[in-house]
Amino acid sequence: MNKQKGLSVKSVVAIGIGAAIYVILARFTSIPTGIPNTNIEIVYPFLALLATIYGPVVGFSVGFIGHALGDFLMYGQTWWSWVLATAVLGLIIGLYGMRLDLDNGVFTVKQMVGFNVVQIIANVISWLLIAPVGDILIYSEPQNKVFLQGATATITNSLSILILGTILLKAYAATKVKKGSLRKD
């Protein structure tokens, strides 16, 4: 039996297209919060969709590449602590997404609740732990500033994924034929 090594072509394409769309969404759909360098981001529901459909490697890669490119193109420099936080967000959501059966048209209320519990935990890990601690260790940023940014990002990103991410996942599942729904006449 010939076992495939590495990423599938489908995953590589998803990473490339996903990262490009990530950069475009980050550039044109960010809504300022009033907290410096912290926005309401529409890109995170998109990342959650890709991570859930294609898995943790694609989620991590799209988050990492998309955020790194977006930072560089928009600001001329990359904030690696936030890039890593985004990648970890995609990874965790992708790991949970492996438990879902979206390709068979299934996304129940119980699964929606589970997805949102996991994405909120992933946002807390990413924005209240990885990003602020990274900012302190890498960039010597003041604690009060980075934890305020992290708390704001946690709340806004969790809410955007809760609302838009859930809608995207439900819409995606609705486009798939439910397993066993077709019968022979």
UniProtKB/Swiss-Prot annotation:
Cited Pfam families: ECF-ribofla_trS (PF07155)
GO terms for cellular component: plasma membrane
Keywords: Cell membrane, Membrane, Transmembrane, Transmembrane helix
Membrane topology: Multi-pass membrane protein
Principal location listed in the UniProt entry: membrane
Transmembrane segments: 6-26, 46-66, 78-98, 118-138, 147-167
Locations listed in the record: Cell membrane
InterPro entries: ECF_substrate-spec-like, UPF0397
Domain of life: Bacteria
UniProt cross-references to NCBIfam families, sorted A to Z: PRK13661.1
Similarity comment: family membership: Belongs to the UPF0397 family.
Name recorded for this polypeptide: UPF0397 protein LGAS_1499
Source organism (scientific name): Lactobacillus gasseri (strain ATCC 33323 / DSM 20243 / BCRC 14619 / CIP 102991 / JCM 1131 / KCTC 3163 / NCIMB 11718 / NCTC 13722 / AM63)
